[in-house]
């Protein structure tokens, strides 16, 4: 863009949209060379506009003297003044607010537009909002419900732009419902729906309670929003809807959104794989591509949402998310295919700059997502290789993004990624470190190196980093050098195995600090802690410190560390240097040191005196000198130390010194304070390498050092770094903490079930197959099988959805919601296959299956909920059903296993054994269970018929009945309940038929606890349905 | 995944467009300072040897690109992937270019309100809402002709 154009033709657009007065004003301002001149012009214009506005106000009541065009012109000028003054002149233009609001009321589009546009700019100021909010909201409501789409559009834009600047709109129920109404209305144009989706998002961001306050509204509105994705033909609405869903999944409730997985996968697959295939039958809408590449916007948005919905390997227990082992294999493979195609596309040569940007967008978005797909080691290593080939790219952005992506990959995928990088590309990375001139890239290189350092390569990497800091040609910002120093300190502490090397490097690092502006107390302090805690380091560190002190220029950090450590351990190196010489050394350094270091040296001196009283006269002289110090701290210290020495002399022994300056006890700070300063490294980066070597993770490094050095003393010190939690984690923990007291997921208990759900539920307890649900639109069949006879606690549940209408059912998706996903749940839902098709033709069917594995006893009322969502004939439907899996479902009938059959004597003896062992524990009684309506006129049924029906029911459940004739009115029943984690339980029951048509049940189980109750509840359900 | 703000200023640091999408600060002085800092940071960068991405604060990084004498800058969350925002910026500039016909800084100066109209058609709630250039231009020409 250059300034080749003259003023005259600068406005190419149609004439009636230009505002001549405004153009002249702007031209005037531009021709004014001096800032002062401009300022004068602005002020005179402001005065003029003020006069016009005042005049208009006086004439109120009469017809509008100012006129819409004039008003628009003046307000636009004020807006220009605001922008061009870099938003500083707010107060000078505030007088125009009233007339700006007046513009909103205009029925002329261009006037209304200028009004809204100006307010969009000014709404970032709370004083503006406070003044005009009520009036604006009123006008906003009128425009939202206007019959002119362009007015609605302006109102939606305004909400979308200022919705987050003030929460006044988001807490106005009329506005939130107004916007939502446009979003859900079948008659709104796609254009308005798109805008309303994003405006609604802006409101939701300011006020989550729009959706969370009222449960019913939450369910209803979220389903409405999700159904906007059903239109698979039109990606344009999808594009605007996904960010809204993204936000809901992240901050409101992800559980509603997990059912979108098949749809999202389909979009991604279409964009990345189908959209780019060169085959002639590539029938995909043009919109799936952009600049000859897959549509980057759709891809990044879909990937972002998928990343939220799929739990990463490290957050396995976050309940409401999808786990990779639970995702339909076909979908998982499709997603993986997308990643590999993106890598292929991303490494292709592209000429057009836009094409290259898009290429990178797609590549990095998918590569960063790949770690969520439980990739094979080979796949990871392939991604890494592809990425590393981009490190040599000429484009700086690509190198930056590649490094960023490698850091993420190494942190999330662990060893396979790390190995692939470090074994083949270390030289390359060091080369980048030394040649890059962009500090943000250098930072990424350092992060990457840090991420894959371990015991094996710590020396090479630390050496490379140290060279970088030392090299004078790297004029990088001091901040970076300081960050690198911190990282070196952490790495040496974490991975050093060689004491000598550890000490050399650490001191080298400290000695640097005077040359660069690194000023890190934390580094020398940490070193002192480590040395104190590891006796094997005492002597060697002290020796080296003396060497450093003897040099002319010792850095402040070296002096401080020396003052502290030599004070403690000088007695260990008397063969190298006498206390007297050490004292002289410190006395020399004293005068050039800053006050904090001086104070430390004073303490060192008295410690030296403690071990070598023969240097007393020098020490006393020194302290006496410092009594005159200008610094109060130094003066006080000298005075106190002098008195202590005198006291010792009077007593004739050094007891008081020994007590006051006892040897330093080991430090027990739990974590390395340096770890807080890792900066922008991803959450797990600090601990990645620890994962590979768990033995190291459990112990702490200084400790480790001493062990490796065969020290017999084991010392406690800092714990491994607490891994930082990322934002997603936090969001999830917030959500999962909303469990109710029974430990059930609140999401489960909040489901509103279909009115006649219980009928199918009861049928499912007693029958292995049948009808689960029927309505005028859909019929659902179920079938329960036990795929493996050895595992009677694992059930395969097949569902069939039949379309009963004459129309198509579209957008079919389901969710299986367990009562608990966290905290050791009673059962798990496994191997969920998504419905075989999302579209069911009239009278056609779709099928689906999943498995339930029962881990321990639970109440049948806590069975999984099946949520079915679909569209039919323009209506959006949700059916929530409970699919019964009871403890009785795990029974194996004695027809299959005759050995379980008991005779009466066995039954009685076992009953007695249970009574003796458990007493009333593990027993449950229920009397007066009324038989259901199928046994009509129960009073008239004979005992025989009643017992026959009971027998049939109980047998169908899988119980075994003892053959006996001695107690006619009672059935003696036995069975074995199976669970995965807690094993099998025996169960004995007496079911007594009363003449009045009711039944008493007494149930005993071989375990204390509520199992007996759970069994009786199943039976009661079947008998009374 | 949302744009925190869109800025456009020239080489001298004069602001041409400013749009905040979230509450950056209740203190207006702070947002003016932020703009000044962003200008200093970006104008000091070497576009040959430095990338188009730079961290700005502990909650924001900047994605920017220079077109002739104008810088277009977007502020986004630190965790966001950068390249898509370059797409945003590039598409925005392409639409401006097509709308004004070989756009230059003067077009943006004199028709700032139209540029805001274009921005509103492309970005609301910090998200991009339309990416089809044809669709955008068709809609914009209708709006531009409305009385």
Curated annotation (Swiss-Prot), chain B:
Chief site of localization: membrane
Subcellular location: Cell membrane; Membrane, Coated pit
Domain of life: Eukaryota
Key words of the record: Cell membrane, Coated pit, Endocytosis, Membrane, Protein transport, Transport
Xref: InterPro entries: AP_complex_ssu, AP_mu_sigma_su, Clathrin_sm-chain_CS, Longin-like_dom_sf
Transmembrane region(s): none
Gene3D superfamilies for the chain: 3.30.450.60
One GO term describing the cellular component: nucleus
Keyword Zinc (UniProt): no
Protein topology in the membrane: Peripheral membrane protein
GO process annotations (BP): endocytosis; intracellular protein transport; vesicle-mediated transport
Assembly: Adaptor protein complex 2 (AP-2) is a heterotetramer composed of two large adaptins (alpha-type subunit APL3 and beta-type subunit APL1), a medium chain (mu-type subunit APM4) and a small adaptin (sigma-type subunit APS2). Interacts with APL1.
Functional summary from the UniProt entry: Component of the adaptor complexes which link clathrin to receptors in coated vesicles. Clathrin-associated protein complexes are believed to interact with the cytoplasmic tails of membrane proteins, leading to their selection and concentration.
Extra remark beyond the main annotation: Present with 1390 molecules/cell in log phase SD medium.
Family: Belongs to the adaptor complexes small subunit family.
Name by which UniProt lists this protein: AP-2 complex subunit sigma
Gene: APS2
């Amino acid at each position: 863009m250059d300034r080749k154009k003259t003023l005259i033709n600068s406005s190419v657009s149609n004439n009636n949209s230009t505002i001549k007065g405004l153009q002249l004003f702007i031209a005037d301002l531009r021709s004014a060379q001096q800032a002062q001149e401009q300022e004068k012009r602005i002020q005179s214009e402001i005065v003029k506009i003020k006069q016009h506005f005042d005049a208009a106000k006086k004439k109120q009541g009469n017809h509008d003297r100012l006129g819409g065009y004039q008003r628009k012109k003046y307000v636009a000028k004020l807006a220009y003044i605001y922008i061009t003054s870099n938003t500083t002149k707010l107060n000078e233009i505030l007088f125009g607010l009233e007339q700006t609001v007046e513009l909103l009321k205009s029925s002329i589009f261009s006037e209304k537009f200028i009004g809204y546009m100006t307010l969009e700019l000014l709404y970032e100021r709370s004083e503006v909002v406070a003044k005009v909010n009520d009036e604006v909201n009123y006008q906003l409501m009128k425009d939202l419900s206007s019959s002119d789409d362009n007015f609605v559009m302006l109102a939606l834009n305004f909400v979308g732009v200022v919705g987050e600047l003030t929460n006044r709109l988001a807490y106005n129920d009329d506005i939130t419902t107004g916007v939502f109404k446009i979003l859900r209305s079948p008659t709104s144009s796609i254009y308005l729906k798109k805008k309303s989706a994003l405006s609604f998002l802006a409101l939701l961001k300011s006020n989550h309670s729009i959706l969370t306050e009222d449960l019913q509204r939450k369910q209803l509105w979220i389903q409405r929003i999700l159904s906007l994705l059903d239109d698979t033909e039109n990606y344009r609405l999808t594009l605007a809807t996904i960010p809204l869903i993204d936000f809901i999944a992240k901050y409101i409730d992800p559980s509603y959104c997990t059912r979108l997985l098949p749809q999202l996968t389909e979009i991604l697959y279409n964009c990345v794989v189908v959209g780019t295939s060169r085959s002639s039958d590539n029938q995909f809408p043009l919109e799936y591509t952009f600049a000859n590449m897959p549509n980057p916007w759709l891809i990044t948005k879909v990937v972002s949402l998928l990343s939220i919905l799929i739990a990463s390997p490290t957050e396995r227990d976050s309940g409401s998310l999808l786990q990779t082992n639970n995702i339909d294999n076909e979908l998982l493979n499709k997603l993986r295919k997308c990643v590999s195609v993106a890598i292929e596309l991303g490494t292709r040569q592209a000429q057009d700059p836009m094409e290259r940007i898009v290429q990178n967008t797609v590549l990095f978005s998918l590569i960063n997502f790949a770690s969520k797909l439980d990739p094979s080691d080979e796949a990871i290593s392939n991604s890494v290789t592809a990425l590393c080939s981009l490190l040599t790219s000429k484009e700086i952005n690509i190198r930056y993004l590649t490094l960023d992506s490698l850091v993420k990959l190494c942190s999330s995928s662990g060893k396979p990624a790390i190995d692939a990088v470090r074994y083949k590309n270390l030289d390359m990375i060091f080369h980048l470190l030394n040649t890059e001139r962009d500090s943000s890239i250098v930072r990424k290189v350092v992060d990457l190196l840090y991420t894959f350092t371990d015991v094996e390569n710590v020396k090479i990497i630390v050496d490379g980093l140290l060279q970088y800091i030392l090299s004078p040609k790297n004029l990088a910002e001091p901040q970076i050098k300081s960050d690198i120093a911190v990282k070196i300190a952490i790495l040496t502490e974490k991975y050093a195995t060689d004491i000598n090397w550890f000490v050399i490097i650490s001191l080298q690092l400290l000695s640097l600090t005077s040359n660069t502006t690194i000023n890190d107390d934390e580094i020398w302090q940490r070193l002192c802690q480590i040395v104190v805690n590891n006796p094997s380091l005492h002597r060697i560190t002290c020796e080296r410190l003396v060497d450093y002190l003897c040099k002319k220029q010792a850095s402040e950090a070296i002096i401080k560390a020396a003052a502290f450590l030599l004070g403690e351990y000088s007695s260990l190196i008397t063969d190298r240097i006498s206390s007297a010489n050490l004292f002289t050394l410190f006395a020399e350094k004293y005068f050039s040191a800053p006050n904090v270091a001086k104070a430390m040296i004073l303490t060192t001196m008295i410690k030296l005196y403690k071990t070598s009283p023969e240097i007393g006269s020098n020490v006393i002289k020194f302290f006496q000198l410092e009594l005159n110090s200008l610094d109060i701290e130094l003066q006080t210290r000298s005075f106190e130390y002098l008195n202590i020495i005198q006291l010792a002399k009077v007593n004739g022994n050094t007891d008081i010194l020994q007590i006051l300056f006892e040897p330093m006890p080991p430090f027990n700070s739990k974590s390395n304070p340096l770890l807080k300063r890792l900066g922008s490294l991803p959450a797990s980066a600090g601990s990645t390498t620890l994962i590979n070597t768990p033995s190291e993770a459990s112990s702490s490094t200084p400790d480790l050092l001493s062990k490796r050095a065969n020290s017999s003393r084991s010392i406690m010190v800092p714990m491994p770094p607490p891994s930082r939690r990322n934002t997603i984690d936090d969001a999830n923990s917030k959500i999962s903490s909303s469990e109710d007291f029974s430990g059930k997921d609140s999401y489960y208990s909040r489901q509103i079930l279909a009115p006649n759900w219980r009928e199918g539920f009861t049928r499912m307890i007693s029958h292995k197959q049948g009808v689960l649900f029927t309505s005028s639109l859909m019929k659902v069949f179920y079938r329960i099988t036990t795929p493996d006879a050895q595992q009677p606690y694992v059930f395969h549940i097949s569902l069939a959805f039949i379309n009963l209408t004459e129309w198509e059912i579209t957008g079919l998706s389901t969710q299986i919601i367990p009562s608990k996903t966290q905290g050791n749940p009673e059962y798990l839902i496994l191997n969920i296959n998504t419905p075989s098709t999302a579209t069911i033709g009239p009278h056609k069917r779709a099928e689906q299956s999943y498995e339930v594995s029962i881990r321990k006893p639970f109440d049948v009322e806590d069975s999984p909920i099946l949520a079915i969502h679909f569209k039919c004939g323009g209506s959006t439907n949700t059916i929530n059903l409970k699919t019964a899996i009871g403890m009785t479902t795990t029974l194996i009938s004695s027809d299959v296993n005759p050995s379980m059959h008991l005779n009466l004597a066995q039954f009685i003896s076992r009953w007695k054994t249970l009574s003796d062992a458990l007493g009333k524990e593990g027993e449950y009684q229920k009397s007066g269970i009324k038989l259901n309506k199928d046994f009509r006129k129960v009073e008239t049924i004979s005992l025989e018929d009643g017992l026959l029906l009971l027998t049939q029911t109980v047998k169908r459940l899988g119980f075994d009945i003892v053959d006996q004739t001695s107690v006619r009115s009672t059935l003696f029943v036995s069975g074995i309940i199976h669970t995965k984690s807690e094993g099998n339980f025996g169960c004995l029951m007496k079911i007594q038929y009363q003449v009045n048509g009711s039944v008493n049940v007494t149930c005993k189980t071989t375990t204390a606890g509520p199992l007996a109750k759970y069994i009786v509840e199943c039976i009661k359900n079947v008998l009374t349905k | 995944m949302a744009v925190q703000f869109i800025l456009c200023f020239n080489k001298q640091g004069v602001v041409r467009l400013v749009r905040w999408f979230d509450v950056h600060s209740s203190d207006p002085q702070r947002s003016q300072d932020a703009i000044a800092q962003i200008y200093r940071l970006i104008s000091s960068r070497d576009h040959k040897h430095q990338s188009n991405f730079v961290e700005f604060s502990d909650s924001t990084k900047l994605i920017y690109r220079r077109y002739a004498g104008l810088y277009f800058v977007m502020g986004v969350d630190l965790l966001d992937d950068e390249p898509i925002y370059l797409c945003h910026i590039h598409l925005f500039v392409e639409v401006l270019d097509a709308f004004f016909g070989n756009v230059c800084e003067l077009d943006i100066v004199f028709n700032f309100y139209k540029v805001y109209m274009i921005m509103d058609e492309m970005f609301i709630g910090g998200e991009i809402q339309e990416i089809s250039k044809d669709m955008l231009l068709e809609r914009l020409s209708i709006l531009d002709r409305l009385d």
